[in-house]
């Protein structure tokens, strides 16, 4: 039937050879409404960059309401601030103080992981949370330094600049990297390009995070064993070589203290995981361990000097660091590269954590707003002696379990850090480095997700392979290259899906007009004279030749099967195009060429249910006209019914 007709035919049921007549209505396949090129471009841009239609809430509103909605959109704190009360404040104060007890020791620990002065970790737990509380859309995200971004920054910068021999330059590069991370993150949000981070697939992140966790854990052997001279490399082989080559530096006092507190921290973590109501045990244990270990070192300082400690930490607010940003020189490219990579990782972690807890409380986290909030807080942080920060899963989990209601919990946490910076810094003088190593170890062990990796193995072997590439790349090559390898494998997977799309043969489920894959439904049966194929992807220049060759191969194989079984001659190939969401000029040419080659073999090509834009392009390219009256149908059932009826009327077998 043509796309402009609509008629009813009588036909013999395709499921049997009886003469039973059934009435099947043959529907027309309509062209989409005509649109100008500008209308099409506008819709396409809207679908790509504005899938959430952010301007919808402003329609049919007064100017006053639009201004209010605009402020709420830019500053989410205005959305819930007017309804804030003492009951909410009580919950936020409790949760804020709880996460502060975790953020203070973690901030010091993660700064050392990034090869930065410990005080920078505390600075980074003060300014960024305040900015996020105003700009962020998550109620439960607890902001501060995180292990993965700290590790990546430390490993990338230390490859070119020594954090000990050239500490000032290293610090400048750290702040500059943070600035570029923020610029990159905010730009993604402003330009609504957040889909770019989707190239970091779940499998990639599982493998990368696990590999980074192993590297971080091995790096902590320096602190746990009391080693003074240690490699600056991050790969597993040089790290383990350094551990055993410096056995003479191992300190039994440090080892005993480290194992003791590590056991306590792991035990409290296990208790809180088994009984979430006891979350406060694992939340308070790092700070309690810092206090107890500091007292122990202070009391035994005159008897042993084997246990190293932090030493002097300056009191006071974050000093300005705008003058330390490094915008010219030999290391600028390194700062930009480090900023982009740490920016991607921290952004991915922050958004994932925010959405996780938002789903538990049934509210929405706006991805683009989060990108801008995280980006702006890192840009501001780089000017106030902070390094890359984002939402931490461990702190956010504690924040959620502690009953946080709004982002005010971040303000409370920052206030607690402020008090620490102003008055309590001398108390950390004797804090042993081994306790910082134990805290980091406890935090990163949970990043190795065995169950997620096993699920990848069960569900998708290629995803599991991607996960392994990321994991071993981080372990044996380097952290950034390991990530790059995993992203490359993910891109190859995408290319394979695009260039080698799936096609399947359909058959009829007896007693119905339903056609489904012969490979999935055993009861489905072939229709004599027809080869029914479904294409399950767009048809582009990258796969058009492959699809053409694959369909011709299907036809050859079907004809060979018919000859072997003395079956009914193959007359028609039906292509179900329901899943073909788009087609380009190469795809159109491939369809036209396929029709021509099939005609030479006395085979008819029929298209079924091409969707809007595909239908429009088929019409404009004259392919529908070339297919003729019986070359286009709405459903496979209608195509089989109409063609079978026509053959029967013409006396064809």
UniProtKB/Swiss-Prot annotation:
A single Gene Ontology CC term: plasma membrane
Compartments in which it is found: Membrane
Bilayer topology annotation: Multi-pass membrane protein
Domain STAS positions: 520-643
Cytoplasmic side: 1-92, 137-140, 189-194, 269-279, 353-370, 429-433, 493-653
Spans through the membrane: 93-113, 116-136, 141-161, 168-188, 195-215, 248-268, 280-300, 332-352, 371-391, 408-428, 434-454, 472-492
Residues in the Extracellular compartment per record: 114-115, 162-167, 216-247, 301-331, 392-407, 455-471
Keywords tagged on the record: Membrane, Sulfate transport, Symport, Transmembrane, Transmembrane helix, Transport
Keyword Transport: yes
A GO MF label: symporter activity
InterPro entries in alphabetical order: S04_transporter_CS (IPR018045), SLC26A/SulP_dom (IPR011547), SLC26A/SulP_fam (IPR001902), STAS_dom (IPR002645), STAS_dom_sf (IPR036513)
SUPFAM superfamilies named in the record: SpoIIaa-like
GO terms classed as biological process: phosphate ion transport
Presence of the UniProt keyword Transmembrane helix in the record: yes
Domain of life: Eukaryota
Predominant subcellular localization, coarse grouping: membrane
Family statement: Belongs to the SLC26A/SulP transporter (TC 2.A.53) family.
Function summary: H(+)/sulfate cotransporter that may play a role in the regulation of sulfate assimilation.
Protein name (Swiss-Prot/TrEMBL): Probable sulfate transporter 3.4
Lineage, top ranks: Eukaryota, Viridiplantae, Streptophyta, Embryophyta, Tracheophyta
């Amino acid at each position: 039937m043509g796309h402009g007709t609509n008629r009813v035919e009588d036909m013999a049921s395709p499921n049997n050879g009886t003469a039973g007549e059934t009435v099947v209505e043959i529907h027309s396949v309509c062209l989409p409404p005509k649109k100008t090129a500008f209308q099409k471009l506008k819709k396409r841009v809207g679908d790509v960059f504005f899938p959430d239609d952010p301007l919808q809430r402003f329609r049919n509103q007064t100017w006053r309401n639009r201004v209010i909605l605009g402020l709420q959109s830019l500053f989410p704190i205005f959305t819930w601030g007017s309804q804030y009360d003492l009951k909410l404040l009580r919950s936020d104060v409790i949760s804020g103080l709880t996460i502060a007890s975790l953020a203070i020791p973690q901030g010091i620990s993660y700064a050392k992981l990034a090869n930065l002065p410990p005080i920078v970790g505390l600075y980074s737990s003060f300014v960024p949370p305040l900015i996020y509380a105003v700009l962020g859309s998550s109620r439960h995200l607890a902001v501060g330094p995180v292990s993965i971004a700290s590790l990546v920054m430390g490993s990338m910068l230390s490859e070119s600049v020594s954090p000990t021999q050239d500490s000032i330059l290293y610090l400048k590069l750290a702040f500059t990297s943070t600035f570029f991370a923020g610029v990159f993150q905010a730009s993604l949000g402003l330009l609504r390009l957040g889909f770019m981070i989707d190239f970091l697939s779940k499998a990639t992140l599982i493998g990368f995070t696990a590999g980074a966790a192993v590297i971080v854990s091995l790096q902590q052997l320096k602190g746990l064993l009391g080693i003074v001279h240690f490699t600056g490399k991050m790969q597993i082989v040089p790290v383990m070589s350094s551990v055993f080559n410096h056995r003479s530096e191992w300190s039994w006092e440090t080892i005993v203290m480290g194992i003791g507190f590590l056991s306590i921290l792991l035990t409290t973590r296990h208790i809180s995981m088994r009984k979430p109501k006891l979350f406060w045990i694992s939340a308070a244990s790092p700070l309690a361990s810092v206090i107890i270990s500091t007292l122990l070192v202070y009391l035994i300082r005159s008897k042993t000097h084997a246990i190293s400690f932090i030493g002097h930490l300056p009191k006071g607010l974050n000093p300005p660091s705008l003058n330390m940003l490094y915008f010219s020189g030999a290391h600028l490219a390194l700062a930009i590269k480090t900023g982009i990579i740490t920016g991607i990782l921290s952004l991915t972690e922050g958004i994932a954590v925010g959405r996780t807890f938002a789903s538990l409380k049934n509210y929405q986290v706006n991805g683009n707003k989060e990108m801008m909030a995280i980006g702006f807080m890192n840009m501001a942080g780089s000017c106030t002696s902070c390094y890359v920060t984002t939402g931490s899963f461990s702190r956010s989990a504690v924040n959620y379990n502690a009953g946080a209601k709004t982002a005010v919990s971040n303000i409370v946490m920052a206030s607690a850090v402020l008090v620490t910076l102003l008055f309590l810094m001398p108390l950390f003088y004797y804090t042993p480095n081994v306790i910082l190593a134990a805290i980091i170890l406890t935090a990163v062990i949970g990043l190795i997700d065995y169950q997620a990796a096993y699920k990848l193995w069960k569900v998708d072997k290629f995803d599991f392979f991607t996960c392994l590439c990321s994991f071993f790349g981080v372990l044996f090559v380097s952290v950034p290259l390991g990530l790059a390898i995993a992203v490359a494998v993910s891109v190859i997977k995408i290319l394979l899906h695009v260039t080698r799309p799936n096609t399947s043969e359909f058959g009829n489920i007896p007693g119905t007009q339903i056609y489904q894959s012969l490979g999935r439904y055993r009861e489905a049966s072939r229709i004599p004279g027809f080869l029914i194929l479904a294409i399950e992807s767009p048809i582009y220049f990258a796969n058009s030749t492959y699809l053409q060759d694959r369909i011709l191969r299907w036809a050859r194989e079907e004809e060979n099967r018919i000859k072997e079984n003395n079956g009914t001659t193959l007359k028609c190939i039906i292509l179900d195009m329901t899943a073909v969401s788009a087609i380009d000029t190469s795809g159109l040419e491939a369809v036209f060429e396929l029709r021509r080659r099939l005609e030479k073999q006395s085979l008819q090509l029929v298209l079924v249910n091409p969707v809007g834009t595909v239908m429009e392009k088929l019409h404009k390219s004259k392919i529908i006209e070339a297919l003729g009256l019986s070359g286009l149908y709405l459903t496979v059932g209608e195509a089989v019914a109409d063609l079978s009826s026509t053959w029967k009327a013409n006396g064809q077998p």
